[in-house]
A protein has these predicted regions:
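Mature, structured domains of secreted/extracytosolic soluble proteins
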Residues: 1-188
Length: 188
């Protein structure tokens, strides 16, 4: 079946209602003091696009911290991570306004996304100032070019491919493009 992308609640309430995917994300938002932003209560930014960090990415970051030689940077829970670092991570994933998949330009098929001749896609600038390219890419179906599914993909000049999961989740104050569980926190 087809599920509806629309949710009759703000972004925070949407994520609070899906603890499997977003429990640690919600904890990070609250710890960073950014709850108002994700609830649509910031006057200058009532609508946002969140390139959604799944809980598994945060969990991996916490586990990976145990490999650090610097014991002051070993975390066992979200609240152990410095608030400023949580804030930095989150703002690297938030864009002002609502950017839907249909608002993103297609990739020029003649070039790979990172090649100099690439003139497709849409450059995204996040609140932390980092930039990446979002692009749509069609697929073939039954041998017919571009007759299949259209995917939203992202590529970072610093980190390469940004794994996507589910685009266009639409709570009342913006849109969430959920990143894949394999996403490494901060690699955007």
């Amino acid at each position: 079946g087809v599920s509806s992308p629309y949710h009759d609640c703000n972004m925070m309430d949407y994520m609070r209602g899906d603890t499997y995917n977003w429990e640690l994300t919600v904890q990070m938002i609250e710890h960073a003091g950014l709850t108002d932003l994700f609830e649509g209560k910031v006057d200058t930014m009532p609508v946002i696009t969140f390139w959604g960090i799944p809980s598994y990415s945060i969990q991996r970051f916490i586990f990976d911290s145990h490999e650090n030689e610097d014991l002051t940077k070993v975390y066992t829970k979200v609240s152990d991570i410095p608030k400023s670092l949580c804030r930095e991570f989150l703002l690297k994933h938030v864009t002002k306004g609502k950017i839907l998949k249909e608002d993103i330009a297609y990739k020029n098929k003649e070039f790979e996304i990172n090649e100099s001749g690439q003139d497709g896609g849409t450059w995204i600038t996040c609140l932390a100032g980092n930039r990446f390219i979002a692009y749509r890419e069609g697929s073939d179906y039954a041998g017919v070019p571009d007759a299949g599914e259209v995917n939203l993909r992202c590529w970072s000049p610093s980190w390469g491919k940004i794994p996507m999961s589910s685009p266009d989740i639409q709570p009342t104050n913006g849109v969430v493009h959920a990143l894949n569980y394999s996403y490494r926190l901060g690699h955007i």
